[in-house]
Amino acid sequence: MANKNYRFETLQLHVGQEQADPATDSRAVPIYQTTSYVFHSFDHAEARFGLADPGNIYGRLTNSTQGVFEDRIAALEGGTAGLAVASGAAAVEYAVRNITQSGDHIVAAKNVYGGTFNLLRHTLPRDGITTTFVSAENPQEFEDAIQENTKLVYFETFGNPNADLPDFEAITAIAHKHHLPVIVDNTFATPYLFRPLEHGADVVVESATKFIGGHGTTLGGVIVEGGNFNWAEVPGKFPTLTEPDPSYHGLNFYEALGGSAFVTRIRAILLRDTGATLSPFSAFLLLQGTETLSLRVERHVENALKVIDYLKTVPEVESISHPSIEGRKDNELYKKYFPNGGGSIFTFDIKGGKDAARVFIDNLHLFSLLANVADAKSLVIHPASTTHSQETLEELEDQGIHQGTIRLSIGTENIEDILDDLKGGFAALRESGLAK
């Protein structure tokens, strides 16, 4: 695929297996269901374990089905290297831990997925890694929060759950001025709608469970490296990448591997030691989803914008959180960064608070009440009592999550059926008299 600049829709079908499988002539990517691999000789085995010869060593680290998936997502994101792991949460933690240690500091947007918020707020501090949370709407807050021991800046393409947008280029410029890498979670946008590496990000993480898999069947995560960040620019700033690693006989990952050092170290060290490995079958299922990613995302976005137009007409709706709405702070950013639209996962606030939300949700029949998002099926949830329930009321309010906040993940069903289901929920709410 390197000899021609194929477009996204072609890349999502072909990268990683441009020709039939050499062992079987299978056109589909085979499921290499194995734990280990035969080395050709004593020297071959030694070279593999020493990272002198890239290739399969053991199933915890690499697998050929997984390798195709990694290459494909890296190509779609425009990166130099990719690593697939067992979940999106594992991808986030590995990416962060790869360049942090006790005594280090992170600057992160406060409007992130609840699991990521808990990782940064509660789990990492136990290991001596602290985070300052700032508003993604205000790039200056990122700069004001940077300390001498800050190691990275972290935010999401679309905030979770309110679909609010950061100013990517402004924030990444600030981070790079201070010699800091930017890690962006691109789960809610996907590389089809937005490629963070083209707007200043250095590392992209995604929950492949969501749009990439697309059908609510498979957990997975992916980390993609941009390959342009100079980890050695500030001596001693990123010792895990620029200083000798004793577990690899003094290997300096950045010197040896350059633009793939970040991802390779995660595979060689973190995945080796903690083993959040993606199974070959999961990699196969995620590849099936990847092949139709653009088609599904177009339909998700088309349906979502029609749902938003409908919600604007409903008197029981207090507010809608979506960057496509004129007058919002991030509407100009939406027009700039998302010319083809985006944001099929968003929230609205319903009059009547939690009790009204309960009636509305319990009277939906097409929408499934569950914690996942970006399924082909339409989904609904009440964040304050579920996905973000471990946060304090103050933290929830600070993130724009209220007792009347409802998150929708708009699927690919017929739009009239989606709207009919929502109308049924609002009809039940009116009958209850709770929407006051």
List the predicted regions and their residue ranges.
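Short hydrophobic/aromatic beta-strand micro-patches
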Residues: 224, 347-349, 409-411
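Conserved N-terminal alpha-helix of the aminotransferase class I/II PLP-enzyme fold
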Residues: 41-93, 115-123
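PLP-dependent enzyme catalytic core of the Aspartate aminotransferase-like
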Residues: 121, 148, 296, 362, ...
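Conserved PLP-enzyme active-site core in the AAT-like
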Residues: 2-3, 16-20, 83-313
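Structural preference for beta-strand elements that scaffold enzyme active sites
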Residues: 152, 181, 203, 319, ...
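Conserved small-domain helix->loop->beta segment predominantly found in fold-type I
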Residues: 274-277, 281-283, 288-292, 297-299, ...
